[in-house]
Amino acid sequence: MAEQGKQGGKVPFGPDYVRAISPYIAGKPISEVAREFGLDEAGIVKLASNENPLGMPESAKHAAAAAIAELGRYPDSNGFELKAALSTKLGVPQDWLTLGNGSNDILELAAHALVTPGQSIVYAEYSFAVYALATQEIGARAIVVKARDYGHDLDAMAAAITSDTRLVFIANPNNPTGTFVPAAALETFLAKVPAEVVVVLDEAYNEYLDDDQQYDSVAWVRRYPNLLVSRTFSKAYGLAGLRIGYAVAQPELTDLLNRIRQPFNVNSVAQAAAVAALGDTAFLQRSAELNRAGKAQLVEAFSRLGLEFVASSGNFVLVRVGDDDDAGARVNVALLRQGVIVRPVGNYGMPRWLRVTIGLPDENAAFIAALERALK
């Protein structure tokens, strides 16, 4: 029973900074929308969670199926096979790698390992919700830097770093806006950051970059001991339901993350599927090509409808659907009633916008038709 306070009321459990957290709200699953609106699941289009519309590669399905036979045993806590595959692909030693239960796990591990209550974490306005969550859950102070053109203002972020800052989060491409920071600007920023401040470069959508945007962040890890690159298998690799990501950093950082991560944080099916997906370059190329075509399909429709949108380097597009602060919620409900799930972003301070995942051509077409009806 909770301790009674002097005035007879219960003393609340937990610290104030934990009770102040707004729980993360994920995109609605298809089954929930079907129940809520009386729809057939088979006809619902989900473009809310930036998943790969191709699903899992066949190679990963076969590897996952084979791994099921050993589910009576604990997974390899150190993830040797996956680390070996990543080590070969990236050209780094295995002790430069940490595996996570999705890249969300990596982001939170970094905050817990590197920041103490009262110290500060810097991140941009309109950036991934987990940055704020990771900051709040450890009692750190958030320094939120105003966005520039819906993306990162790196000069302002460098200037915002204080003597108690220990972590900076940067997503490239950024979620939910899709903006991209060129390599030269990132390198300039890294050179400005004090040695005691760790930069987490969140590259969840890295595989969707066009050829002229590609850069080698792993090479930067070799030069900057305070850089940690975070990546995931949830997006382009199609393994969102298996929850697996990884960090690349020098051993001084990965050692800290490995000290506090759960011993078996990545299950054996996820590890096996990730090894297979990592080697399936044909699937990755097909995913990127499909994404480029789908992005063009959405952009053409938004332009035709006279809707403002943010040029995206990810597998989603942010579109403004009205001029009033109820626009995003209103249009979202109208889409749900038609069996189309997208992501409202009012929780990011963008109530007039919706984020739309790029789907298969027929899914994109269904969304466009539903959007036109919703806007009438």
From Swiss-Prot:
InterPro entries: Aminotrans_II_pyridoxalP_BS, Aminotransferase_I/II_large, HisP_aminotrans, HistidinolP_aminotransfase, PyrdxlP-dep_Trfase, PyrdxlP-dep_Trfase_major, PyrdxlP-dep_Trfase_small. One of its GO terms (molecular function) is histidinol-phosphate transaminase activity. It comes from the Bacteria. Disulfide bonds: none annotated. SUPFAM superfamilies: PLP-dependent transferases. Keywords: Amino-acid biosynthesis, Aminotransferase, Histidine biosynthesis, Pyridoxal phosphate, Transferase. One of its GO terms (biological process) is L-histidine biosynthetic process. It catalyses: L-histidinol phosphate + 2-oxoglutarate = 3-(imidazol-4-yl)-2-oxopropyl phosphate + L-glutamate. Its EC number is 2.6.1.9. The keyword Transit peptide does not apply. The modification N6-(pyridoxal phosphate)lysine is found at K235. The keyword Transferase applies. It is an enzyme of class 2 (transferase). Its cofactor is pyridoxal 5'-phosphate. Pathway: Amino-acid biosynthesis; L-histidine biosynthesis; L-histidine from 5-phospho-alpha-D-ribose 1-diphosphate: step 7/9. Homodimer. This is Histidinol-phosphate aminotransferase 1. It comes from Cupriavidus pinatubonensis (strain JMP 134 / LMG 1197).
